[in-house]
Amino acid sequence: MATQNADVTDATDYKKPPAETEQKALTIQPRSNKAPSDEELVRIINAAQKRGLTPAAFVQAAIVFTMDKGATDSTIFTGKYNTFPMKSLALRCKDAGVPVHKLCYFYTKPAYANRRVANQPPARWTNENVPKANKWAAFDTFDALLDPYVVPSSVPYDEPTPEDRQVNEIFKKDNLSQAASRNQLLGTQASITRGRLNGAPALPNNGQYFIEAPQ
């Protein structure tokens, strides 16, 4: 191989595997890319501590936070853990540069278990056409229940059935489709408000026009 700082001129040595002991020494920390990294989690904890949430109470607050989570990152959080408002924890995620969804994903299992024990299914299932028998499949971070690298639950709960997983997949695809339709409609409305459609010349004044609804 080339010496340090010298240009490589021959690739032969780089087509060989390392020695067995060297290869075995190469390890990674098991983690999920949907959950916060250790560094991200520490940033959130420290940001929350500056607002009055002690590190000792962080896990409990994060579970309540996840139980309070709705459909999107723009959810309006109304709950509290003791006196600490969940809205403040959402803002601390923002301060730390970590999406709210990541924190909720990480604490899904205990939050899900607590909701199951209290028989409080996610409110979304009633207005999202989710079959009653699969109402728990509408849980916002349902995928985390199948992720071995997130925080486990001390309270037992029923594992998702294959049917629940299938319903959740359909549910997610339907929500993505609806979101795309809403974004398209909002974009069209914004263009109309400005007096023109994308790619079209500005409309002249004092005229009456029929604008066909988006397909």
From Swiss-Prot:
Q: Does the keyword Ribonucleoprotein apply?
A: yes
Annotated InterPro entries: Pltvir_coat
Per the record, a Pfam family? Flexi_CP
Ranges of compositional bias, category Polar residues? 24-34
Q: Where in the cell is it found?
A: Virion
Q: Which UniProt keywords apply?
A: Capsid protein, Helical capsid protein, Ribonucleoprotein, Virion
A single Gene Ontology CC annotation of this entry is: ribonucleoprotein complex
- Asked whether the keyword Signal is assigned, the reply is no
PROSITE patterns cross-referenced by the UniProt entry: POTEX_CARLAVIRUS_COAT
> Mind listing the GO molecular function terms for this protein?
structural molecule activity
Q: What is its main location?
A: virion
Chain segments carrying region Disordered: 1-34
According to the UniProt entry, which residue ranges have a biased composition of type Basic and acidic residues?
12-23
Q: Which family does it belong to?
A: Belongs to the potexvirus capsid protein family.
Q: What does this protein do?
A: Required for genome encapsidation. Forms ribonucleoprotein complexes along with TGB1 helicase and viral RNA.
* Name of protein: Coat protein
